[in-house]
């Protein structure tokens, strides 16, 4: 989806422009896109095959070999799925105003029209311009038009410039209201209708992200699917590109690149083949799906020719560091349906003046072990060494704010990737507590010098409350033990049985997930060959393939957490000793 905005400097991380006005609705309702048959819902809609559950029929991804999970696939499939990504990057035309904002049912007094329109445009981040017609009509000497993000509304005419501007503002407000109430123009109009206001100029940043996550899920699964209720825990990663437009404006193109659902972890014994998914919470799964997408982007940039280099979100960079980085004017956003478990959820903590808040018990690291969430200091070492244990989503968000989303394998190839914003659809969360859980653990005191090796640095997320997309009905028990994942380039949803950490199957033990460690190690070696880094191919085990600087930053982070009484980040080197 695209809208005009004021540009940001290349490579800068700025607050999403359209999110400035986002507010929590007093009575939040699940946001639903228009049905596919509605005008503009999908432009164009992909071919659908109802025999295949209504999933889009495009080039099928060919995974490389059985056994240790699916590979990242062939380059052609990734390029073909770019088309689907563009479809998911368009917003359904939804006749709803942003949460917390509304226009009066009747036209305001002319004297108030300009200020009302200015306030409305500023709250959404829309560029508002008033343009005077140099050739007014014969009846009135002044003609002024209001332009909203490049869309010119019907002109206002009067005997003075002030009155013409007021009439132009009234005309723009009336036009916006008509678009909200009826997005389709009457076909019996006596004159050609003006170009419609883009819904991208009306929806906020959070609503746009929610629209993509909801519509992407609906495209992959319909309401008849037994997995439909998994939408209640959906999380997604949205990629935003800024593209220069006309008159110095910048268009923002949003694209859904990863989805995940789930609300629990595998609670069984550890296994050491790398074929078991441990943490199946929606946010964690969406982030792992993002990694799969990034491996594909590396192949696209290295093996896709000139077109692949243009389409990839990664670009080569000179110097001694990783050979690739995120392109300028490209941003990542996280959308989650539920408040992250752990420190962000357990208790409301008012600020304290002594700086002791990060050390309080609720802010300690917490781990899921044997189906229970408890502080890591209370987990017996024997359990950590033998059973699956996963730190809470709150703790992982705090970690990603420092180390980035890329992980230890991609750190060889891509500079740290940080999310620009987090949209949380749970209206019951406490924003200050969420912010402290992510941005204050551990305390990084610059007075003592740099605590982390470069290029790692804490990067704050812009936090927003967003509209929920979950079904209104309670999630059935059948979905509590399942986790779904998808990334841009995958032919469809993968269903994982949380109890086994493997793909759901009729047999007792299904095949490995395409998001498991073994699959990522295979993808790492595939990309290492593509980028011409033979020394990386010599790193045979998963543990050996982890980048040294990333591991050092992780060690420093764990040390600081432990020194500040928050608990040490658990380490399980034996789990990574496998080789493909």
UniProtKB/Swiss-Prot annotation:
Compartments (UniProt record): Nucleus; Cytoplasm
SMART domains xrefs: ADEAMc
Main location: nucleus
Region (Disordered): 1-73
A Pfam family that the UniProt record links to this protein: dsrm
Domain A to I editase, residue spans: 258-579
UniProt KW keywords: Cytoplasm, Differentiation, Nucleus, RNA-binding, Spermatogenesis
Segments of skewed composition (Pro residues): 27-36
GO molecular function: double-stranded RNA adenosine deaminase activity; double-stranded RNA binding; tRNA-specific adenosine deaminase activity
Cellular component terms (Gene Ontology): cytoplasm; nucleolus; nucleus
InterPro entries: A_deamin, ADAD2_DSRM, dsRBD_dom
Domain called DRBM: residue spans: 112-178
Role noted for this protein: Required for male fertility and normal male germ cell differentiation.
Alphabetical list of PANTHER family matching this protein: ADENOSINE DEAMINASE DOMAIN-CONTAINING PROTEIN 2, EUKARYOTE SPECIFIC DSRNA BINDING PROTEIN
Family designation: Belongs to the ADAD family.
Protein name: Adenosine deaminase domain-containing protein 2
Organism: Macaca fascicularis
């Amino acid at each position: 989806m695209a809208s005009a905005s004021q540009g940001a400097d290349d490579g800068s991380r700025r607050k999403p422009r359209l999110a400035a006005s986002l507010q929590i609705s007093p009575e939040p309702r699940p946001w639903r896109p228009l049905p596919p048959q509605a005008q503009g819902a999908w432009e164009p809609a992909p071919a659908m095959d109802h025999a295949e559950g209504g999933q889009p029929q495009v080039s099928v991804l060919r995974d490389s070999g059985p056994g240790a999970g699916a590979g990242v696939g062939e380059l052609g499939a990734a390029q073909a799925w770019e088309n689907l990504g563009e479809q998911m990057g368009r917003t359904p035309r939804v006749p709803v105003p942003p949460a917390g904002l509304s226009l009066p049912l009747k036209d305001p007094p002319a004297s108030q029209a300009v200020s009302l329109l200015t306030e409305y445009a500023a709250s959404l981040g829309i560029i508002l311009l008033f343009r005077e017609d140099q050739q007014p009509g014969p009846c009135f000497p002044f003609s002024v038009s209001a332009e909203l993000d490049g869309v010119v509304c019907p002109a206002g005419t009067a005997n003075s410039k002030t009155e013409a501007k007021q009439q132009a503002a009234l005309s723009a407000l009336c036009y916006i209201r008509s678009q909200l109430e009826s997005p389709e123009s009457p076909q019996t109009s006596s004159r050609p209708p003006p170009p419609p206001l883009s819904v991208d100029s009306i929806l906020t940043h959070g609503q746009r992200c929610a629209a993509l996550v909801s519509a992407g899920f609906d495209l992959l699964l319909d309401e008849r699917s037994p997995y439909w209720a998994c939408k209640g825990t959906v999380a997604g990663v949205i990629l935003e590109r800024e593209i220069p437009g006309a008159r110095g404006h910048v268009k923002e193109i949003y694209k859904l690149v990863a989805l995940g659902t789930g609300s629990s972890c595998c609670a069984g014994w550890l296994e050491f083949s790398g074929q078991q998914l441990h943490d199946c919470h929606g946010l964690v799964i969406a982030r792992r799906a993002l990694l799969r997408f990034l491996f594909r982007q590396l192949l696209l940039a290295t093996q896709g020719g000139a077109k692949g280099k243009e389409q990839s979100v990664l670009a080569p960079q000179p110097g001694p560091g990783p050979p690739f980085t995120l392109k300028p004017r490209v941003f990542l956003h996280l959308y989650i349906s539920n408040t992250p478990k752990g420190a962000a959820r357990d208790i409301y903590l008012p600020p304290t003046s002594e700086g002791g808040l990060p050390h309080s018990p609720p802010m300690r690291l917490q781990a899921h072990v044997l189906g229970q969430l408890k502080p890591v200091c209370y987990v017996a070492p024997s359990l950590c060494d033998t059973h699956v244990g996963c730190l809470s989503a709150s703790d992982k968000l705090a970690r990603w704010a420092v180390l980035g989303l890329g992980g230890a394998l991609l750190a060889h190839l891509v500079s740290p990737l940080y999310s620009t914003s987090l949209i949380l659809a749970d209206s019951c969360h406490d924003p200050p507590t969420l912010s402290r859980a992510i941005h204050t653990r551990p305390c990084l005191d610059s007075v003592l010098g740099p605590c982390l090796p470069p290029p790692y640095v804490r990067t704050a997320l812009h936090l927003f409350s967003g509209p929920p997309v979950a079904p209104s009905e309670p999630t059935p028990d059948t979905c509590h033990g399942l986790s779904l994942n998808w990334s841009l380039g995958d032919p469809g949803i993968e269903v994982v049985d949380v109890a086994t950490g493997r793909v759901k199957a009729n047999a007792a033990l299904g095949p490995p997930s395409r998001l498991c460690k073994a699959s990522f190690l295979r993808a790492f070696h595939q990309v290492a060959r593509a980028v011409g880094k033979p020394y990386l191919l010599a790193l045979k085990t998963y543990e050996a393939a982890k980048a040294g600087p990333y591991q050092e930053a992780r060690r420093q982070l764990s040390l600081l957490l432990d020194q500040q009484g928050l608990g040490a980040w658990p380490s399980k080197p034996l789990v990574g000793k496998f080789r493909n």
